[in-house]
Swiss-Prot record:
The lineage of its organism: Bacteria, Bacillati, Bacillota, Bacilli, Bacillales. This is 1-(5-phosphoribosyl)-5-[(5-phosphoribosylamino)methylideneamino] imidazole-4-carboxamide isomerase. Transmembrane segments: none annotated. Signal peptide: none annotated. It comes from the Bacteria. It is found in: Cytoplasm. One of its GO terms (cellular component) is cytoplasm. SUPFAM superfamilies: Ribulose-phoshate binding barrel. Its EC number is 5.3.1.16. Pfam families: His_biosynth. NCBIfam families: 1-(5-phosphoribosyl)-5-[(5-phosphoribosylamino)methylideneamino]imidazole-4-carboxamide isomerase (TIGR00007). Belongs to the HisA/HisF family. GO terms for molecular function: 1-(5-phosphoribosyl)-5-[(5-phosphoribosylamino)methylideneamino]imidazole-4-carboxamide isomerase activity. Keywords: Amino-acid biosynthesis, Cytoplasm, Histidine biosynthesis, Isomerase.
Length: 240
């Protein structure tokens, strides 16, 4: 997997928002139309778009799925989706609806056998999202912290066939404090797989460091919305 920049769209109540450290009480709305935002990313040159159903993550089922399917069907670039995906039916609906890659998060912790089956069925169309707080996996829209270490979960999921992981350091998400490169690299080594870094990217230099660390990509959200840099600048640096 080559290094890829994933502009991020987090959807809550049908709008494009960003949270700080996953806190639903610390929300900023950046747009009324997720599709228009996604289209603007595509027009700027994005090779992928990353979409999260924040309501879904909390409700443990897809909530903004119609908006997400609209994005997947109308864009010409592949779309990666996470948030509230818990059943085979959820996965089927997204994949059959045009989503290129589905991200499983909490379910990987609580239903490893099911996750193994889904990895066997969907292969490269699946990614495992590992969101960590102080090294331990957080679940249920980050409202709970498990007793499972991020690296242990990554190693187990890699044995089950996972090839792509998305690692988020919750303490840095939405804070523009720089990504946790050390943790991303440790996870990549534990799983011997592709790791996409998420959380904390604040500058073009951060993207360059992630690329230099041989990671598979970076998910960029708040830095774009707050105009720390443009997507065109990020793509020029990151995807050479």
């Amino acid at each position: 997997m080559s290094y890829t920049i994933y502009p991020a769209i987090d959807i809550r109540a049908g709008k494009c928002v960003r949270l700080e450290q996953g806190d639903y009480n610390k929300e900023t709305i950046y747009g009324e139309s997720p599709y228009k935002m996604a289209k603007s990313f595509q027009d700027a040159g994005a090779k992928w778009v990353h979409v999260v159903d924040l309501d879904g993550a909390k409700a443990k089922r897809p909530v903004n799925d119609e908006a997400i399917l609209t994005i997947a069907q109308k864009l010409d670039v592949p779309v990666q989706v996470g948030g509230g995906i818990r059943t085979e039916q959820d996965i089927d609906r997204y994949i059959n609806g045009g989503v290129a890659r589905v991200v499983l998060g909490s379910v990987a912790v609580y239903q490893p056998d099911f996750t193994k089956q889904m990895l066997a069925k969907y292969g490269e169309q699946m990614a495992i999202g590992i969101d960590a707080r102080d090294g331990y996996v957080a679940t249920e829209g980050w409202l709970e912290t498990s007793h499972v270490k991020a690296e242990d979960l990554a190693a187990e999921m890699a044995r089950f066939g996972a090839k792509t992981f998305i690692f988020t350091d919750i303490a840095r998400d939405g804070m523009l404090t720089g990504p946790n490169i050390e943790a991303c690299v440790a996870l990549s080594k534990a799983a011997n797989a592709n790791v996409i870094a998420s959380g904390g990217v604040s500058s073009i230099a951060d993207l360059a460091q992630l690329r230099a660390a041989s990671l598979a990509g970076a998910i960029v959200g708040k830095a774009l919305y707050t105009k720390r840099f443009t997507l065109e600048e990020a793509l020029a640096e990151g995807e050479l």
